[in-house]
UniProtKB/Swiss-Prot annotation:
Residues 63-102 are annotated as: Disordered. Residues 9-68 form the Sm domain. It comes from Salmonella arizonae (strain ATCC BAA-731 / CDC346-86 / RSK2980). NCBIfam families: Hfq, PRK00395.1. The lineage of its organism: Bacteria, Pseudomonadati, Pseudomonadota, Gammaproteobacteria, Enterobacterales. Disulfide bonds: none annotated. This is RNA-binding protein Hfq. One of its GO terms (biological process) is regulation of RNA stability. RNA chaperone that binds small regulatory RNA (sRNAs) and mRNAs to facilitate mRNA translational regulation in response to envelope stress, environmental stress and changes in metabolite concentrations. Also binds with high specificity to tRNAs.
Amino acid sequence: MAKGQSLQDPFLNALRRERVPVSIYLVNGIKLQGQIESFDQFVILLKNTVSQMVYKHAISTVVPSRPVSHHSNNAGGGTSNNYHHGSNAQGSGAQQDSEETE
């Protein structure tokens, strides 16, 4: 399973480290917005006015508000830690939308 996470972990870690606002679309169409506070193999903690634990199996798409560089610098492609935690995440307003109109 580490191979499948070699794309996921660097991407999510870059979003967490750089505190990039993200929109997370769930498989049922609901849109969540916030900043990734931390994540592990099964869940993502999304921070806004409240922290929400979002199970990865319920996620369809993660859309950053801006481009991020997520390439891993280590040749192994993995991380030595299975849990990633943001130190002092900022954010406000956990938002939930059934559908987005732009």
